[in-house]
Protein backbone atom coordinates (compact mmCIF):
# COMPACT_ATOMS: atom_id res chain seq x y z
CA UNK A 1 0.00 0.00 0.00
CA UNK A 2 2.90 2.35 0.74
CA UNK A 3 4.47 1.47 -2.58
CA UNK A 4 1.18 2.24 -4.33
CA UNK A 5 0.93 5.60 -2.52
CA UNK A 6 4.52 6.55 -3.46
CA UNK A 7 3.83 5.65 -7.06
CA UNK A 8 0.69 7.78 -6.97
CA UNK A 9 2.67 10.73 -5.52
CA UNK A 10 5.43 10.35 -8.14
CA UNK A 11 2.91 10.15 -10.94
CA UNK A 12 1.00 13.15 -9.59
CA UNK A 13 4.17 15.26 -9.22
CA UNK A 14 5.35 14.34 -12.73
CA UNK A 15 1.92 15.26 -14.08
CA UNK A 16 2.10 18.59 -12.24
CA UNK A 17 5.53 19.20 -13.71
CA UNK A 18 4.11 18.46 -17.15
CA UNK A 19 0.92 20.47 -17.00
CA UNK A 20 1.57 22.84 -14.08
CA UNK A 21 -1.53 22.27 -11.98
CA UNK A 22 -4.46 20.10 -11.21
CA UNK A 23 -6.37 19.25 -14.33
CA UNK A 24 -7.36 15.81 -15.30
CA UNK A 25 -6.87 12.91 -12.93
CA UNK A 26 -3.42 11.47 -13.22
CA UNK A 27 -2.49 8.12 -14.57
CA UNK A 28 -1.40 6.94 -11.18
CA UNK A 29 -4.78 7.78 -9.69
CA UNK A 30 -6.53 5.91 -12.45
CA UNK A 31 -4.33 2.95 -11.84
CA UNK A 32 -4.97 3.04 -8.10
CA UNK A 33 -8.74 3.08 -8.59
CA UNK A 34 -8.52 0.04 -10.76
CA UNK A 35 -5.96 -1.87 -8.73
CA UNK A 36 -8.67 -4.04 -7.17
CA UNK A 37 -9.80 -5.21 -10.56
CA UNK A 38 -6.52 -6.41 -11.91
CA UNK A 39 -6.63 -9.69 -10.01
CA UNK A 40 -10.15 -10.64 -11.04
CA UNK A 41 -9.82 -9.98 -14.77
CA UNK A 42 -9.37 -13.11 -16.88
CA UNK A 43 -8.68 -11.06 -20.00
CA UNK A 44 -5.09 -11.09 -21.23
CA UNK A 45 -3.86 -7.53 -21.31
CA UNK A 46 -2.34 -6.24 -24.46
CA UNK A 47 1.29 -5.30 -24.06
CA UNK A 48 2.09 -1.72 -25.03
CA UNK A 49 5.29 -1.20 -27.00
CA UNK A 50 6.51 2.40 -27.30
CA UNK A 51 9.01 3.30 -29.96
CA UNK A 52 10.29 6.89 -29.78
CA UNK A 53 12.89 7.73 -32.36
CA UNK A 54 14.94 10.87 -31.98
CA UNK A 55 14.88 13.23 -34.97
CA UNK A 56 17.89 12.66 -37.25
CA UNK A 57 17.35 16.05 -38.80
CA UNK A 58 15.49 19.26 -38.06
CA UNK A 59 12.35 18.32 -39.90
CA UNK A 60 12.27 14.66 -38.71
CA UNK A 61 9.13 13.57 -36.93
CA UNK A 62 8.64 11.58 -33.78
CA UNK A 63 6.99 8.21 -34.28
CA UNK A 64 5.07 6.68 -31.42
CA UNK A 65 3.58 3.33 -32.13
CA UNK A 66 1.22 1.21 -30.13
CA UNK A 67 1.07 -2.47 -30.89
CA UNK A 68 -0.89 -5.26 -29.26
CA UNK A 69 1.13 -8.27 -28.35
CA UNK A 70 -1.00 -11.33 -29.12
CA UNK A 71 -4.64 -12.13 -29.71
CA UNK A 72 -6.67 -12.78 -26.63
CA UNK A 73 -7.31 -16.47 -25.86
CA UNK A 74 -10.79 -17.78 -26.19
CA UNK A 75 -12.47 -18.75 -22.92
CA UNK A 76 -15.05 -21.47 -22.67
CA UNK A 77 -17.94 -21.30 -20.22
CA UNK A 78 -17.91 -25.07 -19.69
CA UNK A 79 -14.49 -25.36 -18.06
CA UNK A 80 -12.86 -23.03 -15.62
CA UNK A 81 -9.10 -23.38 -15.15
CA UNK A 82 -8.03 -21.61 -11.97
CA UNK A 83 -4.34 -22.19 -12.75
CA UNK A 84 -4.82 -20.41 -16.05
CA UNK A 85 -6.64 -17.61 -14.25
CA UNK A 86 -3.77 -17.26 -11.74
CA UNK A 87 -1.25 -17.25 -14.60
CA UNK A 88 -3.28 -14.63 -16.44
CA UNK A 89 -3.54 -12.54 -13.27
CA UNK A 90 0.22 -12.87 -12.63
CA UNK A 91 1.05 -11.94 -16.19
CA UNK A 92 -1.40 -9.04 -16.08
CA UNK A 93 0.13 -7.88 -12.80
CA UNK A 94 3.64 -8.08 -14.25
CA UNK A 95 2.51 -6.26 -17.37
CA UNK A 96 0.82 -3.59 -15.29
CA UNK A 97 3.97 -3.20 -13.17
CA UNK A 98 6.12 -2.89 -16.28
CA UNK A 99 3.64 -0.45 -17.76
CA UNK A 100 3.68 1.63 -14.58
CA UNK A 101 7.48 1.75 -14.55
CA UNK A 102 7.57 2.55 -18.24
CA UNK A 103 4.89 5.23 -17.88
CA UNK A 104 6.80 6.73 -14.94
CA UNK A 105 9.95 6.77 -17.04
CA UNK A 106 8.03 8.35 -19.89
CA UNK A 107 6.51 10.87 -17.49
CA UNK A 108 9.99 11.81 -16.26
CA UNK A 109 11.24 12.14 -19.82
CA UNK A 110 8.17 14.15 -20.69
CA UNK A 111 8.78 16.46 -17.71
CA UNK A 112 12.40 16.95 -18.78
CA UNK A 113 11.19 17.67 -22.32
CA UNK A 114 8.70 20.18 -20.93
CA UNK A 115 11.47 21.93 -18.98
CA UNK A 116 13.67 21.91 -22.06
CA UNK A 117 10.83 23.31 -24.16
CA UNK A 118 10.21 26.08 -21.65
CA UNK A 119 13.90 26.92 -21.57
CA UNK A 120 14.06 26.90 -25.36
CA UNK A 121 10.94 29.05 -25.53
CA UNK A 122 12.55 31.56 -23.17
CA UNK A 123 15.70 31.52 -25.28
CA UNK A 124 13.53 31.85 -28.36
CA UNK A 125 11.79 34.89 -26.88
CA UNK A 126 15.13 36.45 -25.97
CA UNK A 127 16.49 35.81 -29.46
CA UNK A 128 13.28 37.13 -30.99
CA UNK A 129 13.56 40.29 -28.92
CA UNK A 130 17.21 40.68 -29.92
CA UNK A 131 16.33 40.00 -33.54
CA UNK A 132 13.50 42.54 -33.48
CA UNK A 133 15.79 45.04 -31.83
CA UNK A 134 18.46 44.40 -34.43
CA UNK A 135 15.94 44.60 -37.25
CA UNK A 136 14.10 47.63 -35.90
CA UNK A 137 16.83 49.80 -34.42
CA UNK A 138 20.24 48.30 -34.97
CA UNK A 139 20.02 47.86 -38.71
CA UNK A 140 18.64 51.33 -39.38
CA UNK A 141 21.03 52.95 -36.92
CA UNK A 142 23.99 51.08 -38.34
CA UNK A 143 22.79 51.85 -41.85
CA UNK A 144 22.46 55.55 -40.99
CA UNK A 145 25.86 55.58 -39.33
CA UNK A 146 27.33 53.78 -42.30
CA UNK A 147 25.70 56.22 -44.74
CA UNK A 148 26.85 59.22 -42.68
CA UNK A 149 30.36 57.85 -42.44
CA UNK A 150 30.40 57.06 -46.15
CA UNK A 151 29.14 60.58 -46.95
CA UNK A 152 31.84 62.10 -44.76
CA UNK A 153 34.47 59.91 -46.33
CA UNK A 154 33.23 60.71 -49.84
CA UNK A 155 33.25 64.42 -48.99
CA UNK A 156 36.76 64.14 -47.61
CA UNK A 157 37.84 62.14 -50.66
CA UNK A 158 36.34 64.82 -52.94
CA UNK A 159 38.05 67.53 -50.92
CA UNK A 160 41.33 65.65 -51.06
CA UNK A 161 40.84 65.12 -54.80
CA UNK A 162 40.32 68.85 -55.29
CA UNK A 163 43.31 69.64 -53.13
CA UNK A 164 45.32 67.06 -55.04
CA UNK A 165 44.24 68.67 -58.32
CA UNK A 166 45.27 72.11 -57.00
CA UNK A 167 48.55 70.68 -55.78
CA UNK A 168 49.11 69.01 -59.15
CA UNK A 169 48.39 72.34 -60.90
CA UNK A 170 50.81 74.07 -58.53
CA UNK A 171 53.29 71.30 -59.14
CA UNK A 172 52.93 71.72 -62.91
CA UNK A 173 53.34 75.49 -62.55
CA UNK A 174 56.36 74.95 -60.34
CA UNK A 175 57.69 72.47 -62.87
CA UNK A 176 57.25 75.04 -65.63
CA UNK A 177 58.95 77.68 -63.47
CA UNK A 178 61.73 75.23 -62.72
CA UNK A 179 62.11 74.46 -66.45
CA UNK A 180 62.16 78.15 -67.25
CA UNK A 181 64.69 78.80 -64.51
CA UNK A 182 66.69 75.80 -65.70
CA UNK A 183 66.71 77.23 -69.24
CA UNK A 184 67.68 80.61 -67.85
CA UNK A 185 70.37 78.89 -65.84
CA UNK A 186 71.64 77.18 -68.99
CA UNK A 187 71.69 80.53 -70.81
CA UNK A 188 73.49 82.13 -67.90
CA UNK A 189 75.94 79.23 -67.79
CA UNK A 190 76.56 79.70 -71.54
CA UNK A 191 77.03 83.42 -71.03
CA UNK A 192 79.30 82.66 -68.09
CA UNK A 193 81.37 80.32 -70.25
CA UNK A 194 81.52 82.95 -72.99
CA UNK A 195 82.52 85.58 -70.44
CA UNK A 196 85.18 83.27 -69.04
CA UNK A 197 86.40 82.59 -72.59
CA UNK A 198 86.48 86.30 -73.34
CA UNK A 199 88.17 86.91 -70.01
CA UNK A 200 90.75 84.30 -70.89
CA UNK A 201 91.32 85.93 -74.26
CA UNK A 202 91.48 89.32 -72.58
CA UNK A 203 93.95 87.95 -70.10
CA UNK A 204 96.04 86.72 -73.00
CA UNK A 205 95.77 90.16 -74.62
CA UNK A 206 96.70 91.78 -71.30
CA UNK A 207 99.66 89.45 -71.00
CA UNK A 208 100.68 90.23 -74.58
CA UNK A 209 100.23 93.96 -73.92
CA UNK A 210 102.26 93.64 -70.73
CA UNK A 211 104.98 91.85 -72.64
CA UNK A 212 104.83 94.50 -75.38
CA UNK A 213 104.94 97.23 -72.75
CA UNK A 214 107.93 95.60 -71.12
CA UNK A 215 109.60 95.32 -74.53
CA UNK A 216 108.79 98.94 -75.24
CA UNK A 217 110.07 99.97 -71.83
CA UNK A 218 113.26 98.06 -72.45
CA UNK A 219 113.49 99.67 -75.88
CA UNK A 220 112.82 103.10 -74.33
CA UNK A 221 115.52 102.47 -71.78
CA UNK A 222 117.89 101.29 -74.48
CA UNK A 223 117.01 104.31 -76.61
CA UNK A 224 117.45 106.61 -73.63
CA UNK A 225 120.83 105.03 -72.97
CA UNK A 226 121.66 105.38 -76.65
CA UNK A 227 120.52 109.03 -76.58
CA UNK A 228 122.63 109.63 -73.50
CA UNK A 229 125.55 107.94 -75.20
CA UNK A 230 124.97 109.91 -78.38
CA UNK A 231 124.68 113.13 -76.37
CA UNK A 232 127.87 112.31 -74.59
CA UNK A 233 129.51 111.43 -77.87
CA UNK A 234 128.11 114.59 -79.43
CA UNK A 235 129.32 116.66 -76.52
CA UNK A 236 132.71 115.09 -76.81
CA UNK A 237 132.77 115.70 -80.55
CA UNK A 238 131.57 119.26 -80.03
CA UNK A 239 134.22 119.74 -77.38
CA UNK A 240 136.83 118.32 -79.68
CA UNK A 241 135.59 120.45 -82.55
CA UNK A 242 135.54 123.52 -80.32
CA UNK A 243 139.03 122.65 -79.16
CA UNK A 244 140.09 122.17 -82.74
CA UNK A 245 138.35 125.39 -83.72
CA UNK A 246 140.00 127.13 -80.82
CA UNK A 247 143.34 125.75 -81.87
CA UNK A 248 142.68 126.67 -85.44
CA UNK A 249 141.63 130.15 -84.32
CA UNK A 250 144.86 130.46 -82.42
CA UNK A 251 146.73 129.18 -85.36
CA UNK A 252 144.81 131.55 -87.57
CA UNK A 253 145.64 134.36 -85.25
CA UNK A 254 149.15 133.29 -85.23
CA UNK A 255 149.27 132.68 -88.88
CA UNK A 256 147.81 135.83 -90.12
CA UNK A 257 150.01 135.72 -93.00
CA UNK A 258 148.31 132.68 -94.36
CA UNK A 259 144.80 133.81 -95.40
CA UNK A 260 143.91 130.89 -97.57
CA UNK A 261 144.24 128.33 -94.75
CA UNK A 262 142.11 130.39 -92.40
CA UNK A 263 139.33 130.66 -94.89
CA UNK A 264 139.51 126.94 -95.50
CA UNK A 265 139.38 126.19 -91.81
CA UNK A 266 136.43 128.50 -91.34
CA UNK A 267 134.63 126.77 -94.16
CA UNK A 268 135.35 123.40 -92.61
CA UNK A 269 134.22 124.65 -89.20
CA UNK A 270 131.02 125.97 -90.66
CA UNK A 271 130.46 122.72 -92.44
CA UNK A 272 131.11 120.69 -89.27
CA UNK A 273 128.91 122.95 -87.15
CA UNK A 274 126.15 122.71 -89.72
CA UNK A 275 126.56 118.92 -89.85
CA UNK A 276 126.66 118.64 -86.06
CA UNK A 277 123.61 120.83 -85.56
CA UNK A 278 121.77 118.89 -88.21
CA UNK A 279 122.77 115.57 -86.65
CA UNK A 280 121.76 116.86 -83.24
CA UNK A 281 118.45 118.08 -84.56
CA UNK A 282 117.85 114.79 -86.33
CA UNK A 283 118.71 112.84 -83.20
CA UNK A 284 116.43 114.99 -81.07
CA UNK A 285 113.61 114.70 -83.59
CA UNK A 286 114.05 110.91 -83.81
CA UNK A 287 114.20 110.63 -80.05
CA UNK A 288 111.11 112.80 -79.67
CA UNK A 289 109.23 110.83 -82.32
CA UNK A 290 110.27 107.51 -80.82
CA UNK A 291 109.40 108.71 -77.33
CA UNK A 292 106.04 110.00 -78.55
CA UNK A 293 105.37 106.70 -80.30
CA UNK A 294 106.37 104.70 -77.27
CA UNK A 295 104.37 106.98 -74.98
CA UNK A 296 101.35 106.68 -77.25
CA UNK A 297 101.75 102.90 -77.44
CA UNK A 298 102.19 102.74 -73.69
CA UNK A 299 99.12 104.91 -73.13
CA UNK A 300 97.16 102.86 -75.59
CA UNK A 301 98.25 99.62 -73.94
CA UNK A 302 97.51 101.14 -70.53
CA UNK A 303 94.01 102.06 -71.65
CA UNK A 304 93.51 98.58 -73.09
CA UNK A 305 94.79 97.00 -69.88
CA UNK A 306 92.59 99.27 -67.77
CA UNK A 307 89.56 98.48 -69.97
CA UNK A 308 90.38 94.77 -69.86
CA UNK A 309 90.67 94.97 -66.08
CA UNK A 310 87.34 96.79 -65.89
CA UNK A 311 85.70 94.21 -68.16
CA UNK A 312 87.25 91.40 -66.13
CA UNK A 313 85.95 92.93 -62.91
CA UNK A 314 82.52 93.40 -64.50
CA UNK A 315 82.47 89.81 -65.70
CA UNK A 316 83.64 88.65 -62.29
CA UNK A 317 80.80 90.57 -60.63
CA UNK A 318 78.30 89.11 -63.15
CA UNK A 319 79.63 85.60 -62.53
CA UNK A 320 79.31 86.07 -58.77
CA UNK A 321 75.78 87.45 -59.14
CA UNK A 322 74.79 84.59 -61.46
CA UNK A 323 76.36 82.06 -59.08
CA UNK A 324 74.39 83.50 -56.16
CA UNK A 325 71.21 83.47 -58.25
CA UNK A 326 71.85 79.87 -59.32
CA UNK A 327 72.44 78.85 -55.70
CA UNK A 328 69.23 80.58 -54.60
CA UNK A 329 67.28 78.96 -57.45
CA UNK A 330 68.74 75.58 -56.54
CA UNK A 331 67.68 76.10 -52.90
CA UNK A 332 64.19 77.18 -54.01
CA UNK A 333 63.94 74.17 -56.31
CA UNK A 334 65.04 71.78 -53.58
CA UNK A 335 62.59 73.31 -51.08
CA UNK A 336 59.75 73.06 -53.61
CA UNK A 337 60.62 69.46 -54.43
CA UNK A 338 60.81 68.66 -50.70
CA UNK A 339 57.41 70.32 -50.10
CA UNK A 340 55.96 68.43 -53.07
CA UNK A 341 57.29 65.12 -51.72
CA UNK A 342 55.92 65.91 -48.25
CA UNK A 343 52.52 66.80 -49.73
CA UNK A 344 52.48 63.60 -51.78
CA UNK A 345 53.46 61.54 -48.72
CA UNK A 346 50.84 63.25 -46.53
CA UNK A 347 48.14 62.81 -49.17
CA UNK A 348 49.19 59.19 -49.66
CA UNK A 349 49.03 58.55 -45.89
CA UNK A 350 45.62 60.22 -45.63
CA UNK A 351 44.33 58.25 -48.63
CA UNK A 352 45.62 55.02 -47.06
CA UNK A 353 43.99 55.93 -43.74
CA UNK A 354 40.68 56.66 -45.45
CA UNK A 355 40.96 53.41 -47.41
CA UNK A 356 41.67 51.52 -44.17
CA UNK A 357 38.66 53.21 -42.53
CA UNK A 358 36.44 52.26 -45.47
CA UNK A 359 37.73 48.67 -45.38
CA UNK A 360 37.18 48.50 -41.61
CA UNK A 361 33.62 49.82 -41.96
CA UNK A 362 32.93 47.36 -44.76
CA UNK A 363 34.32 44.55 -42.59
CA UNK A 364 32.12 45.70 -39.69
CA UNK A 365 29.07 45.75 -41.97
CA UNK A 366 29.96 42.33 -43.34
CA UNK A 367 30.46 40.97 -39.81
CA UNK A 368 27.12 42.44 -38.69
CA UNK A 369 25.41 40.91 -41.71
CA UNK A 370 27.03 37.57 -40.91
CA UNK A 371 25.95 37.92 -37.28
CA UNK A 372 22.39 38.75 -38.34
CA UNK A 373 22.41 35.76 -40.68
CA UNK A 374 23.74 33.59 -37.84
CA UNK A 375 21.00 34.87 -35.52
CA UNK A 376 18.44 34.12 -38.22
CA UNK A 377 19.84 30.61 -38.65
CA UNK A 378 19.80 30.06 -34.88
CA UNK A 379 16.27 31.39 -34.77
CA UNK A 380 15.30 29.04 -37.60
CA UNK A 381 16.98 26.13 -35.82
CA UNK A 382 15.15 27.00 -32.62
CA UNK A 383 11.88 27.22 -34.54
CA UNK A 384 12.56 23.80 -36.04
CA UNK A 385 13.44 22.37 -32.63
CA UNK A 386 10.31 23.98 -31.19
CA UNK A 387 8.16 22.45 -33.94
CA UNK A 388 9.77 19.06 -33.36
CA UNK A 389 9.18 19.38 -29.62
CA UNK A 390 5.60 20.51 -30.25
CA UNK A 391 5.08 17.41 -32.39
CA UNK A 392 6.62 15.23 -29.68
CA UNK A 393 4.52 16.91 -26.98
CA UNK A 394 1.38 16.40 -29.04
CA UNK A 395 2.34 12.77 -29.56
CA UNK A 396 2.95 12.25 -25.84
CA UNK A 397 -0.30 14.04 -25.04
CA UNK A 398 -2.21 11.72 -27.37
CA UNK A 399 -0.33 8.79 -25.89
CA UNK A 400 -1.28 9.85 -22.37
CA UNK A 401 -4.88 10.44 -23.38
CA UNK A 402 -4.99 6.98 -24.96
CA UNK A 403 -3.41 5.45 -21.87
CA UNK A 404 -5.91 7.22 -19.60
CA UNK A 405 -8.78 6.12 -21.78
CA UNK A 406 -7.45 2.56 -21.70
CA UNK A 407 -6.96 2.63 -17.93
CA UNK A 408 -10.37 4.17 -17.24
CA UNK A 409 -12.11 1.50 -19.39
CA UNK A 410 -14.20 -0.75 -16.99
CA UNK A 411 -12.70 -4.21 -16.58
CA UNK A 412 -15.02 -7.31 -16.55
CA UNK A 413 -15.61 -8.94 -13.10
CA UNK A 414 -14.68 -12.61 -12.95
CA UNK A 415 -15.70 -13.14 -9.29
CA UNK A 416 -18.97 -14.93 -10.17
CA UNK A 417 -17.19 -17.17 -12.75
CA UNK A 418 -20.16 -16.77 -15.08
CA UNK A 419 -18.39 -17.00 -18.37
CA UNK A 420 -20.17 -16.74 -21.59
CA UNK A 421 -19.43 -19.02 -24.49
CA UNK A 422 -18.65 -16.13 -26.72
CA UNK A 423 -14.99 -15.67 -27.42
CA UNK A 424 -13.45 -12.44 -26.21
CA UNK A 425 -10.75 -10.95 -28.29
CA UNK A 426 -8.84 -7.99 -27.06
CA UNK A 427 -8.73 -5.09 -29.34
CA UNK A 428 -6.02 -2.44 -29.20
CA UNK A 429 -6.86 0.58 -27.12
CA UNK A 430 -5.72 2.91 -29.78
CA UNK A 431 -6.56 1.75 -33.26
CA UNK A 432 -5.20 4.60 -35.20
CA UNK A 433 -2.72 7.12 -33.97
CA UNK A 434 -2.68 10.10 -36.23
CA UNK A 435 0.60 11.84 -36.73
CA UNK A 436 0.76 15.40 -38.02
CA UNK A 437 4.03 16.62 -39.48
CA UNK A 438 4.51 20.33 -40.13
CA UNK A 439 7.40 21.27 -42.43
CA UNK A 440 8.27 24.95 -42.48
CA UNK A 441 10.83 26.13 -45.01
CA UNK A 442 12.44 29.56 -44.77
CA UNK A 443 14.87 30.74 -47.44
CA UNK A 444 17.26 33.53 -46.51
CA UNK A 445 19.75 35.50 -48.56
CA UNK A 446 22.26 37.94 -47.08
CA UNK A 447 20.44 37.76 -43.75
CA UNK A 448 17.00 38.62 -45.20
CA UNK A 449 14.03 36.25 -45.46
CA UNK A 450 13.07 35.95 -49.13
CA UNK A 451 10.66 33.00 -49.02
CA UNK A 452 8.67 31.20 -46.32
CA UNK A 453 6.42 28.17 -46.83
CA UNK A 454 4.61 25.73 -44.53
CA UNK A 455 3.47 22.18 -45.41
CA UNK A 456 1.15 19.99 -43.29
CA UNK A 457 1.24 16.19 -43.63
CA UNK A 458 -1.21 13.86 -41.85
CA UNK A 459 0.02 10.29 -41.41
CA UNK A 460 -1.84 7.40 -39.80
CA UNK A 461 -0.31 4.33 -38.26
Swiss-Prot record:
UniProt cross-references to PANTHER family, sorted A to Z: GLIAL FIBRILLARY ACIDIC PROTEIN, VIMENTIN
Domain notes: The central alpha-helical coiled-coil IF rod domain mediates elementary homodimerization.
Name recorded for this polypeptide: Vimentin
Chain positions covered by the region annotation Linker 1: 128-149
Chain's role: Vimentins are class-III intermediate filaments found in various non-epithelial cells, especially mesenchymal cells. Vimentin is attached to the nucleus, endoplasmic reticulum, and mitochondria, either laterally or terminally.
SMART domains on file: Filament
Chain positions of site Stutter: 347
